[in-house]
A protein has these predicted regions:
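Short C-terminal tail/terminal secondary-structure segment
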Residues: 2-10, 108, 241, 252-266
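Canonical Rossmann dinucleotide-binding motif of NAD(H)/NADP(H)-dependent dehydrogenases/reductases
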Residues: 12-44
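Substrate-binding pocket helix/loop in short-chain dehydrogenase/reductase
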Residues: 108-111, 115-123, 217, 221
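Active-site helix of classical SDR
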Residues: 134, 171, 179
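Alpha-helical segment proximal to the catalytic Tyr-Lys
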Residues: 139, 184-188, 249
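Residue(s) in the substrate-gating loop at a strand-loop-helix junction
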Residues: 154
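A conserved structural motif in NAD(P)-dependent oxidoreductases
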Residues: 225-236
Length: 266
């Protein structure tokens, strides 16, 4: 029998919720942190860039948001576990993990030009990093009576995008399997695990690369997107917040495509 649920106003979605955001000091991750805090969340910023962490945390605190930062390489299980423990000790609980840290090779390469070190780098930061964070956070989510994990796949893990390369495609596809299997395992504890699969969005280096394209090349890129445009950064953030919030309380093991229809287009 269905139960009545109160309507959740977006402005109150994360009140008193504690969220860890990996890759949280730059680009999309930083915007996720700011948006969580704007909706009442308490935020722990994990990143490898100490200076960017300091600035992001300062900006959060200046906005009246309870925030801490930790320099974390998600590939290092011991460092991840220690930082997660420090967050739990500081805030008293953890409710949300947003595993936004990831990476790819600077430029796509053909199979023959990919070294074992190249493959290890991409697999480790994406797959091993997500695994390490989930493994460290899940016990704290259980202690909190449940929670949410949002992982990051990509359109590159769901289609044969020519701009991603084999290691990145393999890593982002693996995250989908990790997400589904973990969702099944931890569901009985009230923990939801879902993935977002963004298409191309322009921040930092990618913005510069896109701006340098000839007009005809930019038109070709946009022509592959049924909506005909690139997303605003917040349009990538909002689906993440939805999956992290109680508005998606009956969704787990799912992947949410955020690509303007690019995946549908082939």
């Amino acid at each position: 029998m269905a139960t009545n649920r109160s309507i959740i106003h977006p402005a109150a979605r994360f009140t008193n919720k504690v969220a860890i955001v990996t890759g949280g000091a730059g680009g999309l991750g930083r915007q996720i942190c700011l948006s969580l805090g704007a909706e009442g969340g308490k935020v722990a910023v994990f990143d490898t860039n100490s200076e960017a962490i300091e600035q992001t945390v300062a900006d959060l605190i200046a906005a009246g948001i309870d925030a801490v930062g930790h320099p974390v390489d998600v590939r290092d299980s011991a460092t991840v576990t220690a930082a997660v423990g420090a967050v739990a000790a500081y805030f008293g609980r953890i409710d949300i993990l947003i595993a936004a840290a990831g990476g790819s090779l600077a430029t796509p390469r053909d199979l023959a030009d990919i070294s074992p070190a190249d493959l290890d780098l991409v697999i480790d930061v994406n797959v091993k990093g997500t695994f390490n964070c989930a493994q460290a956070v899940v016990p704290h989510l259980i202690n909190a009576g449940g929670g949410a994990i949002v992982t990051f796949s990509s359109i590159g893990g769901r289609s044969t995008s020519p701009v991603t390369g084999v290691p990145y495609a393999a890593a982002k596809a693996a995250i989908l399997g990790l997400t589904r299997r973990l969702a099944k395992e931890v569901g009985p504890a009230g923990i939801r695990v879902n993935a977002v699969a963004p298409g191309l969005f322009l921040t930092g280096r990618l913005q510069g690369m896109f701006d340098e394209l000839a007009e005809s090349d930019r038109a070709e890129v946009l022509g592959g997107i049924p909506l005909g445009r690139m997303p605003e950064l917040q349009e990538c953030v909002d689906p993440v917040l939805f999956l992290a919030s109680d508005q998606s309380s009956y969704i787990t093991g799912a992947v949410l495509d955020v690509n303007g229809g690019r995946f549908m287009a082939g």
